[in-house]
């Protein structure tokens, strides 16, 4: 059968094997998928030549971040912008004395399945790494070790290497991603303040408003500054929800609350919304015609026919005046609108980052020692359309009253409006933050392990993870790099992980797919 495209990087890939038709399940057309492969091949050629000729520079560093982030799922559907980025990669290749011979990605897709699996883990993992490094650099925080590794990892993709040479690089992706998440945590807290537990309303007040989605807190900061005093309210959506916990953002009284749920519901939630929506990162779904004129993209996000907010290359400043004008034109709702979470709740709470949790570490430790807390669950990761994802809500609802649930990333929308009660003064459900705040979860786990003089694997802690795109891959590799075992992963296992590579992960880390709530809870708690 003739393939129009090949892409299997996300959890929703067709048939659990790969998208090969005229378009991917994500909405990416075959031509766009090919252009993204061409861009990736150009990056591999540039990085390999620069590495071997020792001609790395900050211009190439930035191109690598932009190029890798552009090819992340649900980021860029715009052929023209992808082609322009590839042209910039070609220009830089020529500038350092290389030749334009893009690496043929079919050599990876058609390779031995175990080699393909390891190279896919490297490629998809560094796409996640690049996203986190991109956000940190916008705030002026840079890791030379990360920049150097991305050359090495891209170069490795064009080598005819075996398992023994590729597997260490797979694990190194996890190591570098930990550095990136730590750096981004530092960047966010030093720029926007230390997150604190914050209650967030799901009510949208009457009058003009703007919705901002994605992960870029700096974009939100600029939008809040430019809308201050204009009678326009701002609401977060999706992965922007944890922004409410940062003091430098929460101080703006017109940052009112959160609207909507996880990314996969946006086409329904935005269809009749009388307000513009700003996409700062993934996850963008192809917008319906009914609301496309109200959509704005920025950064590496792009979609044909949608207005794009450019930024100054040096200052990263953006002009949101077109968004503001659209908000005033649309006018918002005539009366307050009470929206709810997926379970009918009218409010959610976020901000339980490592600083907040560890500030009451003695209370947590005493509760464990006294038997008030029997177990911790990290139920975290991405959401999506797979019906099996209802498992995560059902799991959280079934956790006993003497257990604590930590969560992060957009998978939390399945259950973040539930009231699980408290253990003493501690809420049983704690939202740590965005997907990159997996670093906070790691910090909390390590601190608890030190307090109890044991390893993380010996803690009464279980990780029940959901994945969708490539940032989840990089986080999983970080957990494996740290030697964390007994992870349960769902809703399905990645199509790009071969049987042999999966067996390797099972043997070394006892990673396993989710089964049923009852079986998994019994296996964990007995």
Q: Model-derived features: where do they sit?
A:
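Electropositive, gly/pro-rich neighborhoods at or near active sites that engage anionic ligands
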Residues: 40-191, 197
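Anaerobic metallocofactor- and corrinoid-dependent redox/one-carbon enzyme cores
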Residues: 2-37, 44-45, 171-526
